[in-house]
Amino acid sequence: MKRNVVLQLTGVERHYGQGGTLLSILKGADFSISKGEIVALVAPSGTGKSTLLHVAGLLEHPDGGEVNINGHACDGLSDEKRTAIRRSQIGFVYQFHHLLPEFSALENIMMPQLIAGLSWKEAGERAGQLLDYMRIGHRGSHRPGELSGGEQQRVAIARAVANAPTLLLADEPTGNLDPETASYVFDALEALVRQSGLAALIATHNHELARRMDRRVTISDGKIVDF
């Protein structure tokens, strides 16, 4: 594996049964992403973007091939160990923010840190720093329903990186936002990736944002190809 490679997929297969027929989504897919790199995943709906993110994020088991995270093979690991890797090394951002409505922005960002064993004080300090970095420190006490769409997504991004993961997987993170807000949220995301050295794989239909990333890949006949 090349130096600084965070995620490496080698010959990954993923199939689903559909009405007695085997549907092949990923067919010998190869892909790698390195520290500090932002890669756009641009492909039509139904071609396997979410499947790829789920396999890369250890949410689904591949039917063949290898998934390596930071040089460690994840095939054959128990569900407990896969969960431990997800919690410590992988952050997820989705099109819908999935923030807990009864908690403030600050508390939402603290939550994964508290689960990881940090003290309330440590988690609060880290959450506050992330809110400041995302330029919404003044909104920390507000609940998700009191935030704008762009603010909600910035909180979701901050929560995703709260435990300092090495890999960020995002599925249409700006899909529900207007173009101006989407660009602003991506600016914040890009700055965070560059500053922290994260590797980020971002699925998007927004070609303008995709062109701003380091590389663009798509899924063609079950394989991952640059374009």
UniProtKB/Swiss-Prot annotation:
<dbReference type="GO" id="GO:0089705">
    <property type="term" value="P:protein localization to outer membrane"/>
</dbReference>
<feature type="binding site">
    <location>
        <begin position="43"/>
        <end position="50"/>
    </location>
    <ligand>
        <name>ATP</name>
    </ligand>
</feature>
<dbReference type="GO" id="GO:0016887">
    <property type="term" value="F:ATP hydrolysis activity"/>
</dbReference>
<dbReference type="GO" id="GO:0022857">
    <property type="term" value="F:transmembrane transporter activity"/>
</dbReference>
<comment type="similarity">
    <text>Belongs to the ABC transporter superfamily. Lipoprotein translocase (TC 3.A.1.125) family.</text>
</comment>
<dbReference type="GO" id="GO:0005524">
    <property type="term" value="F:ATP binding"/>
</dbReference>
<dbReference type="InterPro" id="IPR017911">
    <property type="entry name" value="MacB-like_ATP-bd"/>
</dbReference>
<dbReference type="Pfam" id="PF00005">
    <property type="entry name" value="ABC_tran"/>
</dbReference>
<keyword id="KW-0813">Transport</keyword>
<dbReference type="GO" id="GO:0044874">
    <property type="term" value="P:lipoprotein localization to outer membrane"/>
</dbReference>
<dbReference type="InterPro" id="IPR015854">
    <property type="entry name" value="ABC_transpr_LolD-like"/>
</dbReference>
<feature type="domain" description="ABC transporter">
    <location>
        <begin position="7"/>
        <end position="227"/>
    </location>
</feature>
<dbReference type="InterPro" id="IPR003439">
    <property type="entry name" value="ABC_transporter-like_ATP-bd"/>
</dbReference>
<keyword id="KW-0472">Membrane</keyword>
<dbReference type="GO" id="GO:0005886">
    <property type="term" value="C:plasma membrane"/>
</dbReference>
<comment type="function">
    <text>Part of the ABC transporter complex LolCDE involved in the translocation of mature outer membrane-directed lipoproteins, from the inner membrane to the periplasmic chaperone, LolA. Responsible for the formation of the LolA-lipoprotein complex in an ATP-dependent manner.</text>
</comment>
<dbReference type="InterPro" id="IPR017871">
    <property type="entry name" value="ABC_transporter-like_CS"/>
</dbReference>
<dbReference type="InterPro" id="IPR027417">
    <property type="entry name" value="P-loop_NTPase"/>
</dbReference>
<comment type="subunit">
    <text>The complex is composed of two ATP-binding proteins (LolD) and two transmembrane proteins (LolC and LolE).</text>
</comment>
<protein>
    <recommendedName>
        <fullName>Lipoprotein-releasing system ATP-binding protein LolD</fullName>
        <ecNumber>7.6.2.-</ecNumber>
    </recommendedName>
</protein>
<keyword id="KW-1003">Cell membrane</keyword>
<keyword id="KW-1278">Translocase</keyword>
<keyword id="KW-0547">Nucleotide-binding</keyword>
<keyword id="KW-0997">Cell inner membrane</keyword>
<dbReference type="InterPro" id="IPR003593">
    <property type="entry name" value="AAA+_ATPase"/>
</dbReference>
<keyword id="KW-0067">ATP-binding</keyword>
